[in-house]
Regions:
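Extreme N-terminal basic, low-complexity initiation segments
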Residues: 2-4
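Extracytoplasmic cell-surface/polysaccharide-interacting catalytic and binding patches
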Residues: 11-85, 167, 178-187
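A residue-level signal for beta-strand positions that form part of recognition/binding surfaces
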Residues: 42, 89, 118, 160
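Amphipathic alpha-helical interface surfaces
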Residues: 74-78, 88, 101, 117, ...
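Extended, low-complexity, intrinsically disordered C-terminal regulatory tails
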Residues: 77-106
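Active-site microenvironments of hydrolase-like enzyme catalytic domains
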Residues: 108-121
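Catalytic cores and adjacent binding grooves of peptidoglycan-active enzymes
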Residues: 115, 123-187
Length: 187
């Protein structure tokens, strides 16, 4: 009996150690802070972390401090300059996704959304093709993808633009198109 008790304590300790290895950083902020935090002139933390899927499934989509800082950089280097240039609101379809949310929406395991480095965006009344071309020609970025736009030059309501930003020394300036036919380089 003593041997069994010792074995149980050892097993419990091993489980605690394993759990600590996979433990995510603690969220940086209280939920109230998310609702009020203005990351840049026109973007809030609430809109960058909001997800209908997270809400309906009861998933916590609170970023860590590191993820928050990367979203702040994305706003400073890409989203806010776009908003300032076009003078129109930018619709954020998806920005930050915690691991559980990313799995729930079928996102890539290496998705930059999980790091706070990417956003799927649109500007109402503007074709996503034109938006992507402007970013490609005028901004620093890591990855730029025209997603699910079958007739990209003519249908302003089709798909969205995925844009990510890491840092000037790491950004790849990779341009892709993804649609029903597959993935190709460029637009």
């Amino acid at each position: 009996m003593v041997f069994i008790n010792i074995c149980m304590k050892i097993i419990q300790k091993i489980i605690e150690i394993i759990k600590s290895l996979f433990k995510k950083e603690e969220p940086i902020i209280e939920k109230e802070f998310i609702m009020e935090n203005q990351i840049s002139k026109n973007f809030t933390l609430a809109e960058l972390t909001y997800s209908d899927t997270a809400k309906s499934k009861g998933l916590d989509n609170t970023p860590t401090e590191s993820e928050y800082m990367k979203m702040k950089t994305l706003c400073e280097k890409v989203l806010q300059p776009l908003r300032d240039h076009f003078g129109k609101p930018i619709r954020i379809n998806s920005c930050y996704r915690g691991k559980q949310l990313n799995e729930a929406v079928g996102g890539s395991k290496t998705s930059q959304h999980c790091k706070g480095e990417a956003a799927d965006i649109e500007i109402m009344g503007m074709s996503n093709y034109d938006l992507a071309c402007y970013i490609r020609d005028n901004m620093d970025f890591d990855q730029l993808i025209l997603e699910y736009t079958e007739n990209i030059k003519n249908d302003i309501n089709a798909g969205w633009v995925h844009v990510s930003y890491v840092s000037p020394s790491v950004n790849r300036k990779q341009c892709l198109t993804i649609n029903k036919s597959g993935t190709k380089l460029g637009f």
